[in-house]
C-alpha cells in the first residue's frame, strides 16, 4: 500500500515537472517572431515573513524605549517614518496586526483553518507590548497611524464629548469584524482598509510579493484620500474612532505595567500640554472644578443602570433582525439567492456565481439548506453583536 502511494506521488510530481504539451499546433511566422516564454514569479520566501515579525518586535522595543526612557518625540517620528516605509510602502500594509484579529477569530471558529504562526506573532506582539509599556504600537509602529501623522499639519481640537462619542465606532467595528470573520463571510477590516490601496500605489515591494498587483478599488482609494484630507485638520481620525485593533489596545492599556507620564519633577505646571496634544490624550485635572452633587450623581447612575438592560435587549432584537441582510455578505447565501431567483424565473440568464454552483452538479435543496443554516448563524451572531453594541453604549454613558 505504501509503495502504491509513493508511486502515485512520484507520477504526479513527474507529470507536474514535465513541460505541458500544446493542444494545437503553433503557427509558423516568417517575420522572425519568437514566442515569449511564460514566466511565473517565485513564491515569497517564508523566512522573509519572520523578518517582518522581527522588524515588528524590534520596532516595538525601540519605540517603547524612546517613549518611556529617552522621551524623544523626534526619534519616535523617525521610527514611525521607517515603519511607514517598511510595513506601508514595502509590504503594502499586509501583513498587519489590525487585520490579524480576523485570522485569529476564524481559526478559533473554524477547525479547518490553521492560523499561520506569523499572523499569530503579529496579533500577539502588540498586545504584549501594550500590557508592558502602553500603546507604543499605535504611537510609532503602525503604518496606518504613521501615514495619518504625516499629514496632520494643522490639527484642531475636537470637543471631548464628540471625541468620546465617536470612539464608540471602533468597538462596534471590532464586533462586526469578529462576526463576519467567525462565519467565514468576509474579512471586512482588510476589505475596507482606507490606506492599503494607497500603500500599493507605490510599488516598493519585492518581486513576487503582494505588491506586484494593485488590488485596491477606486472607491477605497477615494475613501483613503478623504480620510487623509480629514487628517490634515483632525489628527488620526481612523485611529481614534474607527480602528478595531486600537479599540482592543485601548482597553488593555489600562492595565499596562508602565505608562507615559508627565514627569512631576520636570513639570512647571504651565498646563500648555493639555491643549497642545492633537489627539486629546491628556485628561485635564479636575481639582479646580466644583465637587459634583452626590445625590444627583447617584440618581443618574441608578437611571443608567436601569437603562443598560433596555439597551442590551434593544440591541439584541435589532441585531437578530439584521441577521439575514448581514448574511448576504457570505458567498453561499448570495449564491443560493441567485439560484433561487433563476429557478422561479424572476431573472433571466445566469451569472458566474450561479454557473459555479451548476458546475458542481449538487442538488439545489442542498444549497438552500446550507444557506439557511448560515442565515441562522448570522441571526445568532447578530443578536450577540447587538447585545455587545448595547453594552458598549451603556458603559460609555456610565463612564
PLM segments and residue spans:
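Active-site/substrate-binding loop(s) of hydrolase catalytic cores
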Residues: 1
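Non-ligating segments of multi-cofactor redox enzymes
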Residues: 16-268, 272-275, 280-399
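Bacterial N-terminal signal peptides
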Residues: 4-13
